């Protein structure tokens, strides 16, 4: 949905022709005018009951024109992964940071990875893994960057039997390679 700045109305905007339907993808701001959408899992026709694939692509959405552009795709490696809710883009250092985790097991883990923002190349793993109970819609993880404290924060949440288990992890920024 988009809201008019001059009128009090909303308009539906569809990106399904430009970005294949997906979930378990990450999004974040590249700058004031650009939202990035990275990776995920879904079906190109939007019919997940027919099977899903993991996506390793990055899209940019201009929030002024609502135009979408595919920036890159990295080759599917043997270690399938999906992305936490938020991604962090560092234009100055040409890096895209994401919490990544395998979506094919429930006793999973999260790993902070970076990719070159302009190409998707030079995938780098950071720090150690974080234990993560993955149960589709009952769990999520997200990444935040605090520029004042120069910290990255990874937040995990797992809901089970009407109870939530929430964990917060911090890491100095910029992160060090493993």
Model feature map: region roles:
Residues 21-24, 54, 81-85, 137-139, ...:
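Beta-rich catalytic cores
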Residues 37-54, 98-109, 157-168:
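Short, conserved, GDST-rich strand-edge loop motifs in beta-rich repeat architectures
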Residues 35-37, 96, 152:
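Hydrophobic beta-strand positions that form the internal "hydrophobic ladder"
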Residues 67-85, 118-148, 177:
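Conserved blade-ending motifs and adjacent loop-strand segments that build the rim/top face
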Residues 1-54:
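N-terminal pre-first-transmembrane soluble regions of secretory-pathway and organelle membrane proteins
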Residues 137-178:
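Blade-level signature of beta-propeller repeat domains, shared across WD40, Kelch, NHL, RCC1
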